[in-house]
Amino acid sequence: VNIISSIAKNDINSTSYSLCMDICSPTFRKLIAEKNVDVIYADPPYTAQQYSRFYHIPEVLHSYKYPKLQMFRGKYTQGIYPEEKYKSPFCSKIKAKGAFEFIFDMAQNHDCSLIVSYSESKKEKTGNERMVTLEYLLQLAHKKLPHHSLSKINFDFDYRQLNRGDKIVENKDDKEILLVFK
Protein backbone atom coordinates (compact mmCIF):
# COMPACT_ATOMS: atom_id res chain seq x y z
CA VAL A 1 0.00 0.00 0.00
CA ASN A 2 1.45 3.33 -1.01
CA ILE A 3 0.56 6.40 1.02
CA ILE A 4 1.03 9.80 -0.57
CA SER A 5 0.88 12.62 1.95
CA SER A 6 1.79 16.27 1.90
CA ILE A 7 4.40 15.60 4.60
CA ALA A 8 5.73 12.27 3.33
CA LYS A 9 6.52 13.70 -0.12
CA ASN A 10 9.49 15.46 1.49
CA ASP A 11 10.32 12.73 3.99
CA ILE A 12 12.02 9.88 2.12
CA ASN A 13 12.44 7.68 5.21
CA SER A 14 8.76 7.79 6.19
CA THR A 15 7.59 7.10 2.65
CA SER A 16 9.91 4.16 2.03
CA TYR A 17 9.18 2.76 5.47
CA SER A 18 5.45 2.78 4.88
CA LEU A 19 5.87 0.98 1.56
CA CYS A 20 7.59 -2.02 3.12
CA MET A 21 5.44 -2.51 6.21
CA ASP A 22 2.51 -4.70 7.03
CA ILE A 23 -0.45 -2.33 6.72
CA CYS A 24 -2.10 -3.80 9.79
CA SER A 25 0.88 -3.33 12.13
CA PRO A 26 0.65 -0.91 15.08
CA THR A 27 3.71 0.98 13.76
CA PHE A 28 2.05 1.56 10.41
CA ARG A 29 -1.18 2.70 12.08
CA LYS A 30 0.78 5.19 14.22
CA LEU A 31 2.73 6.46 11.21
CA ILE A 32 -0.39 7.01 9.11
CA ALA A 33 -2.30 8.61 12.03
CA GLU A 34 0.36 11.33 12.28
CA LYS A 35 0.25 12.31 8.59
CA ASN A 36 -2.00 14.45 6.43
CA VAL A 37 -2.87 11.90 3.77
CA ASP A 38 -4.10 13.05 0.35
CA VAL A 39 -4.20 9.77 -1.56
CA ILE A 40 -3.91 6.10 -0.70
CA TYR A 41 -2.81 3.86 -3.59
CA ALA A 42 -3.29 0.14 -3.00
CA ASP A 43 -1.95 -2.53 -5.35
CA PRO A 44 -2.28 -5.59 -3.14
CA PRO A 45 -2.11 -9.20 -4.26
CA TYR A 46 -5.44 -10.36 -5.71
CA THR A 47 -4.77 -14.07 -5.35
CA ALA A 48 -3.18 -16.59 -2.97
CA GLN A 49 0.14 -16.02 -4.77
CA GLN A 50 2.48 -14.23 -2.34
CA TYR A 51 4.04 -11.02 -3.69
CA SER A 52 6.60 -10.75 -0.90
CA ARG A 53 9.07 -12.99 -2.72
CA PHE A 54 9.35 -10.42 -5.51
CA TYR A 55 10.26 -7.57 -3.14
CA HIS A 56 13.47 -9.08 -1.80
CA ILE A 57 15.76 -6.18 -2.81
CA PRO A 58 13.60 -3.39 -1.28
CA GLU A 59 13.25 -5.43 1.91
CA VAL A 60 17.03 -5.91 2.19
CA LEU A 61 17.61 -2.20 1.56
CA HIS A 62 14.99 -1.28 4.14
CA SER A 63 15.79 -3.70 6.95
CA TYR A 64 19.37 -4.69 6.07
CA LYS A 65 18.49 -8.31 6.82
CA TYR A 66 19.85 -10.99 4.55
CA PRO A 67 17.36 -13.85 4.61
CA LYS A 68 18.31 -17.48 4.43
CA LEU A 69 17.01 -18.58 1.04
CA GLN A 70 14.64 -21.48 0.56
CA MET A 71 15.82 -24.60 -1.28
CA PHE A 72 13.49 -26.83 -3.30
CA ARG A 73 14.75 -30.01 -5.00
CA GLY A 74 18.34 -28.94 -4.43
CA LYS A 75 17.94 -25.49 -6.05
CA TYR A 76 17.13 -22.03 -4.75
CA THR A 77 13.53 -21.06 -5.45
CA GLN A 78 12.75 -18.36 -8.01
CA GLY A 79 11.48 -15.06 -6.70
CA ILE A 80 13.59 -15.57 -3.57
CA TYR A 81 11.47 -17.13 -0.86
CA PRO A 82 13.08 -16.30 2.49
CA GLU A 83 12.49 -18.96 5.13
CA GLU A 84 10.39 -16.59 7.27
CA LYS A 85 8.66 -14.85 4.41
CA TYR A 86 5.94 -12.28 5.01
CA LYS A 87 2.46 -13.49 4.13
CA SER A 88 0.10 -10.73 3.11
CA PRO A 89 -3.41 -10.77 4.57
CA PHE A 90 -4.59 -9.92 1.03
CA CYS A 91 -3.53 -13.45 -0.03
CA SER A 92 -5.87 -15.13 2.43
CA LYS A 93 -9.58 -15.78 1.86
CA ILE A 94 -10.06 -15.40 5.61
CA LYS A 95 -8.05 -12.17 6.07
CA ALA A 96 -8.46 -10.31 2.75
CA LYS A 97 -11.79 -8.67 3.56
CA GLY A 98 -10.41 -7.31 6.83
CA ALA A 99 -7.30 -5.97 5.08
CA PHE A 100 -9.43 -4.16 2.50
CA GLU A 101 -11.70 -2.81 5.25
CA PHE A 102 -8.61 -1.38 6.94
CA ILE A 103 -7.61 0.46 3.75
CA PHE A 104 -11.12 1.82 3.22
CA ASP A 105 -11.26 2.86 6.89
CA MET A 106 -7.97 4.76 6.45
CA ALA A 107 -9.40 6.60 3.44
CA GLN A 108 -12.57 7.37 5.40
CA ASN A 109 -10.68 8.55 8.51
CA HIS A 110 -8.34 10.79 6.50
CA ASP A 111 -11.10 11.95 4.13
CA CYS A 112 -8.73 11.26 1.25
CA SER A 113 -8.87 9.72 -2.19
CA LEU A 114 -8.35 5.98 -2.59
CA ILE A 115 -7.01 4.24 -5.69
CA VAL A 116 -7.20 0.44 -5.80
CA SER A 117 -5.55 -1.62 -8.53
CA TYR A 118 -7.52 -4.78 -9.26
CA SER A 119 -7.95 -7.51 -11.82
CA GLU A 120 -11.12 -9.51 -12.25
CA SER A 121 -10.63 -13.25 -12.64
CA LYS A 122 -12.09 -15.37 -15.35
CA LYS A 123 -11.67 -18.41 -13.10
CA GLU A 124 -12.65 -20.97 -15.73
CA LYS A 125 -9.70 -19.81 -17.88
CA THR A 126 -6.97 -19.22 -15.31
CA GLY A 127 -7.98 -21.16 -12.23
CA ASN A 128 -6.56 -18.25 -10.22
CA GLU A 129 -9.43 -17.19 -7.97
CA ARG A 130 -9.40 -13.72 -6.43
CA MET A 131 -9.58 -13.37 -2.65
CA VAL A 132 -12.31 -10.69 -2.90
CA THR A 133 -14.62 -9.81 -5.76
CA LEU A 134 -14.99 -6.50 -7.52
CA GLU A 135 -18.58 -6.45 -6.28
CA TYR A 136 -17.34 -6.72 -2.68
CA LEU A 137 -14.95 -3.77 -3.17
CA LEU A 138 -17.73 -1.63 -4.62
CA GLN A 139 -20.08 -2.53 -1.75
CA LEU A 140 -17.35 -1.71 0.75
CA ALA A 141 -16.77 1.66 -0.91
CA HIS A 142 -20.49 2.42 -0.84
CA LYS A 143 -20.52 1.66 2.91
CA LYS A 144 -17.23 3.31 3.93
CA LEU A 145 -16.89 6.13 1.36
CA PRO A 146 -20.48 7.17 0.60
CA HIS A 147 -19.51 10.73 -0.40
CA HIS A 148 -16.73 9.68 -2.79
CA SER A 149 -17.35 9.40 -6.51
CA LEU A 150 -16.07 6.36 -8.40
CA SER A 151 -14.09 6.33 -11.62
CA LYS A 152 -13.27 2.91 -13.04
CA ILE A 153 -10.31 2.94 -15.41
CA ASN A 154 -10.01 -0.15 -17.61
CA PHE A 155 -6.63 -1.00 -19.07
CA ASP A 156 -6.07 -2.91 -22.26
CA PHE A 157 -3.55 -5.29 -20.76
CA ASP A 158 -3.97 -8.44 -18.73
CA TYR A 159 -2.91 -9.30 -15.23
CA ARG A 160 0.15 -11.52 -15.58
CA GLN A 161 1.71 -13.76 -13.03
CA LEU A 162 5.46 -13.72 -12.84
CA ASN A 163 5.89 -17.18 -14.32
CA ARG A 164 8.22 -18.84 -16.78
CA GLY A 165 7.14 -18.41 -20.39
CA ASP A 166 5.97 -22.01 -20.73
CA LYS A 167 3.73 -21.60 -17.65
CA ILE A 168 1.84 -18.52 -18.91
CA VAL A 169 -1.84 -19.03 -19.76
CA GLU A 170 -2.31 -17.26 -23.10
CA ASN A 171 -6.12 -17.41 -23.40
CA LYS A 172 -7.03 -15.60 -20.22
CA ASP A 173 -8.89 -12.31 -20.04
CA ASP A 174 -7.97 -10.83 -16.65
CA LYS A 175 -7.90 -7.11 -17.43
CA GLU A 176 -6.26 -4.72 -15.01
CA ILE A 177 -8.46 -1.92 -13.68
CA LEU A 178 -8.06 1.03 -11.34
CA LEU A 179 -10.86 1.99 -9.00
CA VAL A 180 -10.53 5.68 -8.12
CA PHE A 181 -12.62 6.92 -5.22
CA LYS A 182 -12.42 10.68 -4.65
Predicted segments with their positions:
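Conserved Class I SAM-dependent methyltransferase catalytic core
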Residues: 84-149
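Short, well-structured alpha-helical interface segments that form or flank functional binding sites
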Residues: 18, 39, 95-102, 174
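Structural motif
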Residues: 41-43, 115, 180
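A short acidic (Asp/Glu
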Residues: 29-35, 50-58, 125-134, 162-164
